[in-house]
Structures are given as structure tokens and as C-alpha cells.
Amino acid sequence: MRNIRLTKNGIECSDSVSTVYLDPKKIQNQGVHFVSHAHIDHLPNSGDGTILSSTEPNKIAQLRGVTLKNSTDSLENFTLVDSGHIFGSKGLLFDDIFYTGDISTRDRGFLKAAKIPKCKTLITECTFGLPEFVLPPVTEIVKQVNEIIANLYSKGKPVLLLGYELGKAQTLSQLFGDWDPIYYHDSVKKMNDLHRSMGVPLKDSIGHTEAESKGLLDKKPWVMVAPMMSAKNNFIKHMKTKYDVITIGFSGWANSKKFGFSRGTDYSIPLSDHCDYNELIQLVKESEAERVYTIHGFVDEFALDLNKLGFSAQPLREISLDNFC
């Protein structure tokens, strides 16, 4: 029977014997600290306590200058579950509790859809926990973007594909890796090279600094995968001014009317590393959970919708809860 609560240090699941910290901000001296993946907002400050994490986040964290000390990928009575968010991302199943971390239940290139385990208590993210967030199939997105690129290539226009440096950029590198030539922003190249060393089948290429120094960017058209950045960024300004590049930004927020995706890109494409609304609903159904806690996103709205559907759901807040599991 664990008490689940949200604290300033993340989610704590405690009983009289031990505490499990889910994506904590700081590592304590005692307890088990689960790190779901290597996005910066999920990496904890250093500490001496035990860290449970898959091997991939450790290597990615090191590339980003973060060391996960005392880390293991296996502990008795704890099961790591592929979450499909980014490479190496996991959810955690323990004591009939399933914590999703950031999760996606759709295939996207080398990333495979998360499989939802049965549990009594579900702690789920709901980044896109409003009905307006329903994303098109990945096959439809790939077809649309390939048509855009083909049209631009016919006009001699180079293309920048913009997505988060870790996660989205690797997906874009694979989904659109057949275009030639393809280059990578230097930061994306470093991340891609690390992924390739861990077995991810990404096309090898050079970084933008080398490509520019060799005059390769003058030989248009080309495709480049770069981190998400606004039109005001100096890199984008330079690429626009010197090479007349066309930018395509990828985000789950791309089609939102209320929460507009405003980075000043020429095209905005709704591709996400998270579940959309319908996928979140299906996730909850597949878990067969008796109790659902919503975190990260539209927690109140999504919990209300779940209750209307007959589930027992509530947002997880920074107070002790009277509900136990």
C-alpha cells in the first residue's frame, strides 16, 4: 500500500518500508529513483541514492554533461516498460502501479509503440489531454512532407526540418533520410552519432559547419535536420538570408487553435513524441486501472473526461493524497 503524492521533487510513492521517486529533480540518499528518459527536464541533479534507468538515458545524459551515478537497469520487483517516447525511454511497473513517464503508443520509424501493462493504479502524462489534440497517422504526415520537399526540390529550394534535438530530430532523420543530400545541424549530428553507436539505423552524414565550410550548402537543393528554434534565431536567419531555405517545424501543437505553434516556420506539421487525446483514452482503457492519476499537461480536463467515461481519476497535486494503492 503506497501513498502517492506530488512534491517539489517529483512524484513520491511511499510505504512504511521504502520510497520510490518517479523522475525526481534531486537524488536522495535513500530509496529508488526512476529516471524515465534523458530529456533535460527529466534528468535529476546528482546524488548518492540508487537510480533505476535503462542504459540509453545514461549514455545520452553523459553526452549532455550529466552523470547518473549509482545507476542500474534492473531491480527486483521493478519492471521497465518501453514507452515509445524517445530512444531508451521507459515507463515503470511496480506494486501494481504503472507510471507512464512520457509515452507514445504509435510507431514512428525506429520507435515502436508502447505496450500498456495491466495495473491497479495508473499514473499517466496527459500533455495532449484535450479532445482537440488528435494527430494524423504518421504515414499521412510522411506523405505530406515528402510532397512538400519534392515540390521545393523541383524549384532548387533547400529545406530545414526542425524538431527537438533529442527524440524528434532522430525520428525526422530516419523518416526523411532517403533525401539526398541530407545534412545535420552539428548538435543533431552528435546526437545521431551516439544513437548510431547504440544500434539505431540512422543515415550517416556531416554537420552543418563542415558542409558550409566545404561549400556544399551552395549546391542546392538539400535537406538538413536541425533543432527546433524560432525564426529569430541567428542560425535560421543565416540560413534564410544566405541559402533561401524553407523551414518545416514538427510539433504536436502545430494545428492547435488555442495553443498555437508559433515559431515562424514556413510549414508546421503535427508530429509528436507523446500520445494524442484518443491514444491517452485508449491507454487508460488498456491498463484496466482501478485508479488513474493525471500528471503533466491538461490534468484537470483529462481527469474530468475520464470520470465521465466511468474511470476513477484525479489530478496529482503537490499535497498528500487520501487515496492509497
Features from the language model and the residues they span:
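Binuclear metal-ion centers of metallo-dependent hydrolases, dominated by the metallo-beta-lactamase
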Residues: 1-6, 116, 130-206, 211-216, ...
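His/Asp/Glu-rich metal-coordinating catalytic cores
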Residues: 2-28, 32-34, 40-160, 167, ...
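Short acidic low-complexity segments
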Residues: 11, 19-28, 204-220, 234-238
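Short coil/turn segments at beta-strand junctions that form active-site/ligand-binding loops
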Residues: 18, 31, 49, 95, ...
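Short internal beta-strands
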Residues: 49-59, 123, 180-191, 249, ...
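Active-site-adjacent beta-strand anchor residues
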Residues: 51-54, 162-163, 270, 295-296
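Active-site-proximal loop/helix segment associated with metal-binding centers of metalloenzymes
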Residues: 86-95, 103, 107-108, 121-128, ...
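C-terminal regulatory/interaction regions
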Residues: 211-325
